[in-house]
Amino acid sequence: MVTTGPVNSDDDVGKVTWTYGTVEVRVRVPAGRGLWPAVWMLPLDHESRPEIDILEVIGQDPGRMMMHFHPSDRDDDSPNKDYRLTGKNLAEGWHTVRLDWQPERLTWFLDGKQVWHLTGSQVPDEPMYLVLNLAVGGVYPGPPDETTKLPATFEIDGVRITKNEPQ
């Protein structure tokens, strides 16, 4: 049996949303087929539906960090944008991922080094919230197999959100 679920900052206990600023998360990701840890953001108003993926790792390839920007569903002419960083095994030790979100600019960092950025008017300008989760199975990561060590844990050592509302 596998139990998993997201932790997000848009819950009934206390909504933490922001428009522009920095989110930094210290993580240790699990390795193994079928495991899919992610740090991502969604809009408070689910109608517009842009999505910012700060970190995604497929467990069978922990040496590849994926970052994505999915524009609004209402903008059919805007393709998804993504970047894959290879060479650092994220299942080995702790790593810090960070997103700096400014008007018309998104910048991704891994362990203090800038790894990707996007600019343009499609950068969200509405309140968003943070989601931390470990998905198991599904089409994208595939099912766990005999090589997957369970239980598996997506460890979060800390989350820091700095709001930076423009003047």
Identify what each model region corresponds to:
Residues 1-167:
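GH16 jelly-roll
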